[in-house]
From Swiss-Prot:
This is Probable Brix domain-containing ribosomal biogenesis protein. It comes from the Archaea. Keywords: Ribosome biogenesis. Probably involved in the biogenesis of the ribosome. Transmembrane segments: none annotated. InterPro entries: Brix, Brix_dom_Rbsml_bgen_prot. SUPFAM superfamilies: Class II aaRS ABD-related.
């Protein structure tokens, strides 16, 4: 899987692209002037996420299949914890927890293991957890919130 930016990304969008790629064990590229066909060639038949912007800040994630078809998008505002600067991402795949349409869409896209919310505390200390609700997505590492998306909108295509 690949995480990439919009065509002329801000520094904040590049930072989010890197964070998402490390959290999901994916590759990250700054797209630059790369068109959609070049991007599809670069993904080598894998799915990809495009980090879009709103007023110079990351504000939308567009989830595409291996043929470039837009599957769904999430509009959001983001918040980062102070822990993120010193956090070392372990070499493990995250697990998902949560219910609802957004959780279902993310599970089908990422294919990460899904756990019940009451089992999250039983996971190993170095686990990465994507806790998905109707209004926010919390990206947690080692039991602490690293960054969050406040969801502004969700659309399936």
């Amino acid at each position: 899987m690949l995480v990439t930016t919009s065509r002329k990304p801000s520094a904040k969008s590049r930072t989010l692209c890197k964070l998402l790629s490390r959290f999901t064990a994916s590759r990250c590229i700054s797209r630059g002037k790369m068109g959609m066909q070049e991007l599809l060639d670069f993904t080598e038949g894998n799915t990809f996420i495009v980090v879009g912007e709103y007023h110079g800040n990351p504000g939308e994630l567009s989830f595409h299949d291996n043929e470039g078809k837009l599957l769904f998008s999430i509009r959001f505002s983001d918040r980062y914890s102070e822990e993120i600067d010193s956090y070392w991402f372990p070499d493990v795949l995250p697990v998902l927890t949560g219910e609802g349409e957004i959780a279902e869409a993310l599970e089908s896209f990422f294919h990460f293991e899904r756990v019940e919310s009451d089992r999250v505390v039983q996971l190993p200390q170095n686990s990465l957890v994507m806790a998905i609700g109707d209004k926010e997505i919390d990206f947690m590492g080692s039991g602490k919130s690293l960054f969050k998306f406040n969801i502004k909108g969700f659309k399936k295509y």
